[in-house]
C-alpha cells in the first residue's frame, strides 16, 4: 500500500470532485484526487447536459470532442402530462461526452 501526505484529499474524480480538487490546488493546497475507478468518466452515470451559463461562470473551456450537441432550449418533464420548455438564453445548454469532459477536468 502506498502512502502520500497531502493537505486536501478529494475522494471521487467526477465533475464535482475534480472541480473541488482544482480549486484547492489553485488555492495553494497540496491536493490529492483519488477515485475507485481505473478510468475517469466511465461508466457515465448522468449529468451529460450542462448549461452554457454554468460553463461561463466556472470559466470552463470544453476540450476537443467533449461537446456532443448544442441545445437551444431546456425541457423539464414531471411526467408525460406536465412539460415546460424554455428557450430563454439562460437555459441554452450543451450535451457532453462525459468520458472526455471528466478526464479534462
What are these regions (language model features)?
Residues 5, 37-61:
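Conserved N-terminal glycine-rich FAD pyrophosphate-binding loop of Rossmann-like flavoproteins
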Residues 9, 13, 22-45:
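Glycine-rich FAD pyrophosphate-binding loop
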Amino acid at each position: 500500500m502506498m502512502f502520500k501526505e497531502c493537505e486536501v484529499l478529494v475522494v471521487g474524480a467526477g465533475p464535482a470532485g475534480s472541480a473541488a480538487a482544482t480549486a484547492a490546488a489553485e488555492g495553494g493546497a497540496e491536493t490529492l484526487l483519488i477515485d475507485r475507478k481505473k478510468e475517469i468518466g466511465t461508466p457515465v452515470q448522468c449529468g451529460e447536459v450542462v448549461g452554457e451559463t454554468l460553463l461561463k461562470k466556472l470559466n470552463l473551456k470544453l476540450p476537443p470532442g467533449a461537446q456532443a450537441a448544442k441545445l437551444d432550449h431546456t425541457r423539464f418533464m414531471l411526467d408525460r402530462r406536465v412539460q415546460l420548455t424554455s428557450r430563454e438564453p439562460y437555459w441554452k445548454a450543451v450535451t457532453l461526452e462525459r468520458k472526455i469532459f471528466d478526464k479534462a477536468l
